[in-house]
Amino acid sequence: MSVLEASEIMQLIPNRYPILFMDRVDELNPGESIVVTKNVTINESFFQGHFPGNPVMPGVLIIEALAQAASILILKSEKFAGKTAYLGAIKDAKFRKIVRPGDVLKLHVQMVKQRSNMGTVSCQAMVGDKAACTTDLTFIVGATDSK
């Protein structure tokens, strides 16, 4: 059973189809960690061009999925409720496994440090027991722009 479904996720972050890369939040320990599921299907719009006949999820979109999971982790804290988490930096990104249609991405994000409105998270995108991507992300929390 999930902690947050897609409709609840969309109440927290501004991303929508086709740039919403999570289906549900499976585990959430506010201020500490989150585990999110992204079911990768052949219907994803990016597979039309990446690559025809050899569909591969772009690495930058795996990073985006991890950033979205990190946003949920950050924005579920009382301190940042109603704000927006922005990606500030990507550090040491490594891509270790190709992600294809039919794969289930498990996005694991762990809070490393947080100060004021900035912080760092350690991330892993897993397919089964294999890491598809690992990285550290820096985030900045700001006001939600209503324009």
Curated annotation (Swiss-Prot):
Keyword Lyase carried by entry: yes
Gene3D superfamilies, alphabetized: Hotdog Thioesterase
GO molecular function: (3R)-hydroxyacyl-[acyl-carrier-protein] dehydratase activity
EC number(s) given by UniProt: 4.2.1.59
GO cellular component, one term: cytoplasm
Subcellular location: Cytoplasm
CDD domains given in the database record: FabZ
GO process terms (BP): fatty acid biosynthetic process; lipid A biosynthetic process
Active site: 50
One Pfam family this sequence matches: FabA
Record's catalysed reaction(s): a (3R)-hydroxyacyl-[ACP] = a (2E)-enoyl-[ACP] + H2O
The protein's enzyme class: lyase
PANTHER family: 3-HYDROXYACYL-[ACYL-CARRIER-PROTEIN] DEHYDRATASE (PTHR30272:SF1)
Family of this protein: Belongs to the thioester dehydratase family. FabZ subfamily.
NCBIfam families in the record: fabZ (TIGR01750), PRK00006.1 (NF000582)
Role according to the record: Involved in unsaturated fatty acids biosynthesis. Catalyzes the dehydration of short chain beta-hydroxyacyl-ACPs and long chain saturated and unsaturated beta-hydroxyacyl-ACPs.
Name of this protein: 3-hydroxyacyl-[acyl-carrier-protein] dehydratase FabZ
Organism: Lactiplantibacillus plantarum (strain ATCC BAA-793 / NCIMB 8826 / WCFS1) (Lactobacillus plantarum)
Organism lineage: Bacteria, Bacillati, Bacillota, Bacilli, Lactobacillales
Name of encoding gene: fabZ
